[in-house]
A protein has these predicted regions:
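Catalytic cores of TIM-barrel enzymes
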Residues: 1-200
């Protein structure tokens, strides 16, 4: 508890410029360092969640930074991204070598004439335009109608029918499978974060 309080005070003083901290806070965006120090590749920790947890737990204990080294910034659930055919980024073993970090794919994912669509209804825009563009597995969602079409009785059947479309069904199946994989990842990673927070 005393160590946690010292770190919190150090960070608060430095961030809010409230006097001089006892030392410079150590805040690391460690990337894949916790993995590589254990002899693992970035690919390994996008596939084996137990190894991810072990590597990040040990790195936090050894490095003793003032903030958490969290795997959520690097060790993504690779299989979930593969299931959805995510195109907005490449990750270790999928578009970049297994030893490389993830890379964003710079492309015009949002068109210049779509800002009004985004501003008018962000959820509708993301569901019908953006997500189908950035993930091949979600292309079917572009065929869905707005949930607002279900408000009146005459709009109900056409809205419901879209959910039976084979492309929509395929996207739903992929999203469900990716959700299960992300839950398997989260079932390992989030308890680690809870443990590290509890340790102070």
């Amino acid at each position: 508890a005393a160590e946690y309080k010292a770190r919190a005070t150090r960070l608060k003083k430095a961030i809010l410029l409230e006097g001089e901290p006892d030392r410079t806070p150590v805040c690391l965006l460690a990337g894949y360092y916790p993995a590589t120090r254990k002899g693992l590749t970035p690919y390994d920790v996008t596939q084996d969640y137990d190894k991810t947890v072990d590597a990040w737990l040990e790195a936090n204990h050894v490095v003793q930074a003032d903030t958490l080294l969290a795997p959520v910034f690097a060790a993504i659930p690779g299989r979930a991204y593969e299931i959805l055919d995510v195109e907005i980024l490449n990750w270790p073993g999928h578009g970049v070598p297994k030893e490389a970090s993830f890379q964003y794919n710079e492309k015009e994912w949002m068109q210049a004439d779509e800002y009004d669509l985004l501003i008018d209804d962000p959820t509708d825009y993301l569901l019908h335009y953006y997500l189908p563009r950035v993930a091949g597995g979600l292309r079917g969602f572009a065929k869905l109608m707005s949930p607002l079409d279900m408000v009146e009785i005459v709009g109900g059947p056409p809205w419901m029918m879209r959910w039976a479309d084979p492309d929509v069904q395929a996207s739903l199946e992929k999203l469900t499978a990716a959700g299960r994989e992300a839950a398997a990842w989260g079932g390992k990673v989030y308890p680690l974060l809870g443990r590290l927070v509890a340790e102070g």
